[in-house]
Amino acid sequence: PMWGINYLTKPKFELPQLQDHVSEGTNTATSIGSYFTTMLDQSMNWKDAERLSSKWGGHFALKGIMSVEDAKKAVDIGCTGIMVSNHGGRQLDGARAPFDQLAEIVDAVGDKIDVICEGGIQRGTHMLKALSVGAKACSGGRLYLYALASAGQEGVEKALGIYRTELERDMKLMGCKSIKELNRSCLLYTSPSPRDTLL
């Protein structure tokens, strides 16, 4: 493939702004698994997060919250937002999806902190479901990164436009005129528990 020819014949890929700080900014080969293993700092703890939140002095959100217990800790240390996220399932593909515990986290802390559903959002209908459960917002890297890589800013604007169009169309089909009208009664589950699979 062409990428192989380019790899051999073109100048080596480098990120000069990072190469003095991390080896991942150089042309040193590394596996994705090794890269992410080195990124995970096991020494980070709740006291560190509380100190960061305090020093920041403004809105502060933690990403990677996957349990009610951690959501409550985030409230206790002064976070103003949390991102319910399993980081796209890349590191632990057997982990629950963010949507699977969104309802219980919203029920526990949604009146005290902004809960953002991050990950697995691939369509406007996914945003519609997360907002109906009680998320204040939705987020995702793939939402815009693929569009950015393929078509730059215009691609991102087009992708976001598709999400918005789908969200607005489906809200109209549901008879909702405002995001504020979305709630769990808008959803139909296969069993009484909101943590179970949607139809």
Language-model features, listed with the residues they occupy:
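Alpha/beta catalytic cores of nucleotide-metabolism and tRNA/nucleoside-modifying enzymes
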Residues: 100-191
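Active-site entrance/lid segments in N-terminal catalytic domains of soluble metabolic enzymes
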Residues: 1-76, 88-91, 100
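Single conserved hydrophobic/aromatic residue that forms the stacking wall/gate
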Residues: 189-199
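Glycine-enriched alpha-helix->loop->beta-strand junction motifs that scaffold or abut catalytic
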Residues: 56-58, 76-81, 109-112, 134-137
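Glycine-rich, proline-tolerant flexible connector loops at the mouths of alpha/beta enzymes
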Residues: 86-93, 148
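Generic beta-strand/beta-sheet core signal
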Residues: 63-65, 84-87, 116-118, 140-141
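Second-shell residues forming the walls of enzyme active-site clefts
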Residues: 81, 94-102
